[in-house]
Amino acid sequence: MASSDIQVKELEKRASGQAFELILSPRSKESVPDFPLSPPKKKDLSLEEIQKKLEAAEERRKSHEAEVLKQLAEKREHEKEVLQKAIEENNNFSKMAEEKLTHKMEANKENREAQMAAKLERLREKDKHVEEVRKNKESKDPADETEAD
């Protein structure tokens, strides 16, 4: 574009800046456009070239399909590994919970048995004491009766 194609008109001047209006003159018929209006014509392709392009396209399709299948297989394998790991962790958790519960139940059983043994021992001590008191009383009673007579 030549400088004669553009006109600059000042609109207003402010402290924040200036405003301009640019007026572009219409293009002349003689000027050559910067870009071609139609795409360049393609050369005619031979049957061999067409066949090669079709084979290359088929090869690309097969390669893409193989890549997609490979990715799917990898994804399935990963899913299997994740599932196996989850099952293993679940089993480990179950075993640990079962062992913990068994240990707790054994501790409770031992505690209960110890408490029962302690109660039985106290009862035996009480029976022994009662028997001693009875013997002492019986041994004193006949003596008291003879003295009183």
Curated annotation (Swiss-Prot):
Family annotation (InterPro entries): Stathmin_CS, Stathmin_fam, Stathmin_sf
Pfam families: Stathmin
Compartments reported by the entry: Cytoplasm, Cytoskeleton
Domain of life: Eukaryota
Region (Disordered): 27-46, 104-149
Record bears the keyword Protein transport: no
Domain SLD, residue spans: 4-145
N-acetylalanine: modified positions: 2
Coiled coil segments of this chain: 41-140
Record note on quaternary structure: Binds to two alpha/beta-tubulin heterodimers. Interacts with KIST.
Function: Involved in the regulation of the microtubule (MT) filament system by destabilizing microtubules. Prevents assembly and promotes disassembly of microtubules. Phosphorylation at Ser-16 may be required for axon formation during neurogenesis. Involved in the control of the learned and innate fear.
Protein name, entry field: Stathmin
Gene: Stmn1
